[in-house]
Swiss-Prot record:
It comes from Pisum sativum (Garden pea). Residues 18-98 form the GS beta-grasp domain. One of its GO terms (biological process) is glutamine biosynthetic process. The gene is GS1. The keyword Signal does not apply. Belongs to the glutamine synthetase family. Pfam families: Gln-synt_C. The keyword Isomerase does not apply. This is Glutamine synthetase nodule isozyme. Its EC number is 6.3.1.2. It is found in: Cytoplasm. One of its GO terms (molecular function) is glutamine synthetase activity. Residues 105-355 form the GS catalytic domain.
Amino acid sequence: MSLSDLINLDLSGTTEKIIAEYIWIGGSGLDLRCKARTLPGPVTDPSELPKWNYDGSSTGQAPGQDSEVILYPQAIFKDPFRRGNHILVMCDAYSPAGEPIPTNKRHAAAKVFSHPDVVAEETWYGIEQEYTLLQKDINWPLGWPAGGYPGPQGPYYCSVGADKAFGRDVVEAHYKACLFAGINISGINGEVMPGQWEFQVGPSVGISAGDEIWVARYILERITEVAGVVLTFDPKPIKGDWNGAGAHTNYSTKSMREDGGYEIIKKAIEKLGKRLPEHISAYGEGNERRLTGKHETADINTFSWGVANRGASVRVGRDTEKEGKGYFEDRRPASNMDPYVVTSMIAETTILLKP
């Protein structure tokens, strides 16, 4: 018998009990933490799950003398690692008094998404999550010679072949695991820089876009753990003439998707332009290294938009222009952005902010 036989042990004929993996965001605001508990039987709704707690002093989220942080279950996904009726549970974190802790960005986002004006607009998001795979012991991109560089960019985007595409096994495993989990993953592709990949989630409505991105990140990190490679969401992992990593956020409201929507899109983009500093400061750490005006980005200090322009802050697709309705893409969020913050801020600026 091998270890993997035991890991893959099917419990369904033996016990009703299930395992729930509680997932939360740690003290850096980007690190994911998790722990598992046994429950008496299958669960279909987060409201059926017990709250739990953890030692916040060990995650940089509470002092040692008052270390308890409370987990509130918010969203359930099927567990692709344990399979069966086992589940992954996305949680957010609160003080014992019931206050959201500072790294809990979901709480404020949920308030925006439950506002009647936002609910009426049925906000859709499609998020393009880029990431880079690194060799474990040297923290250098997968497929790159140790301490050296591959040939210049050009052959790698959406490429095939052992000399161009590095880490596809991780990418494929992640794609299927997300589909199994019930995440609305809509595609994958190899990126411009070798060792860099992208997956897309959406269209997802409101707060669920944030839940799905966070759980997709968790699943990816678990897969890289097994594969022995390191995952980074750094927006510019390699200095120089190499593309950075972003999380382009595609967005539409009900009004934008209906006839005459293009005019609403233009007004929404205008509103985004008026809140440039607020959005940039919320769009990810280290983004100034990526938003230089080169490598398919707009300069961080200016706001621009255009049809089919990948050098603009906001891009409108040709189809949207032609049909007079559709969606737009905010190209500024970095790969390490918090999707709760970005999605709710876009909704707040475009729907709740009166001109």
